[in-house]
Amino acid sequence: MTHQVSVLHQDKKFDVSLRPKGLKEFCGQAQLTERLELFLNAAIQRGEVPGHCLFFGPPGLGKTSLAHIVANTVGKGLLVASGPQLVKPSDLLGLLTSLQEGDVFFIDEIHRMGKVAEEYLYSAMEDYKIDITIDSGPGARSVSVDLAPFSLVGATTRSGMLSEPLRARFSFTGRVAYYSDEDLATILRRSSNLLGIDADASALYEIARRSRGTPRLANNLLRWVRDFAQMREGNCINSDVAEKALAMLLIDEWGLNEIDIKLLTTIMNYYQGGPVGIKTLSVAVGEDVRTLEDVYEPFLILKGLLKKTSRGRMVTQLAYNHLKRCSDNLQSLGEEK
């Protein structure tokens, strides 16, 4: 089996250029970063390898960046793997034995590891040992192999799917939450400086408030607005230009996109506002269940537009009000033209 394993310098140039190198550069998540800084520095001061860390939260909020920061803080190497690729012990063997003392082993989507591989990881995390089976058949024997002490960093969008034995082996657990518009605007200012984009503060705030509290999306939208301004507005990036660019992507003032609106209007128009089951909704809007649950629902629930009940999903009165207001705005714009 071929592992998609990478180290820091193999990331895409764009992502690396924007990725914060240390906790001082990491904007937002103040309580989490304060605890993490204390946790790491205490271990460094004692001359120990930091304990294992677990970060959980919606996609795009900086869990991978935090893994890189852990490695940068302890000054060691970073090895990256993806949970779905770790199915059996042999998938882990080469990775674990390649680690040097103090290295950080980052497993993204750790909740999707195979059960057998996960159990194989227990002794590696707790005792820095693994058992290797030599030969096969009647002559097979198990040999215990010592590993170099390392720090495992796991990231998951679904912490509830982690088994209790695995969760209990993490010394540090941190929830990465959605960002405020102000924090996103600060992140975008840093990104625009790094990328050489000349944008005024009002434009950055306009992008921030439509970015669903997610830095990854904010940076992607910043690039889109840059491209739009380059081709349509003579490289001028102000709030009006940002609004035009984001309207072209069908992103409204709350950050709702075409799929969000389709999801809400489907429940309203075809299921009388709900409740409707997630599988039925998946077929109706043409998105798989996992994408709806991980990408779209958390933000809609956070904004108070959707609620989950024991019988299914329901839209709220706020959703009706918001979509009516958007419709009225579009109609008035059409009349002005």
UniProtKB/Swiss-Prot annotation:
Molecular function GO labels: ATP binding; ATP hydrolysis activity; four-way junction DNA binding; four-way junction helicase activity
Binding site for DNA: 308, 313
Keywords: ATP-binding, Cytoplasm, DNA damage, DNA recombination, DNA repair, DNA-binding, Hydrolase, Nucleotide-binding
Enzyme class: hydrolase
Region of interest: Large ATPase domain (RuvB-L): 1-179
Keyword Transcription regulation recorded: no
Function: The RuvA-RuvB-RuvC complex processes Holliday junction (HJ) DNA during genetic recombination and DNA repair, while the RuvA-RuvB complex plays an important role in the rescue of blocked DNA replication forks via replication fork reversal (RFR). RuvA specifically binds to HJ cruciform DNA, conferring on it an open structure. The RuvB hexamer acts as an ATP-dependent pump, pulling dsDNA into and through the RuvAB complex. RuvB forms 2 homohexamers on either side of HJ DNA bound by 1 or 2 RuvA tetramers; 4 subunits per hexamer contact DNA at a time.
Stated family: Belongs to the RuvB family.
UniProt protein name: Holliday junction branch migration complex subunit RuvB
Organism the protein comes from: Chlamydia abortus (strain DSM 27085 / S26/3) (Chlamydophila abortus)
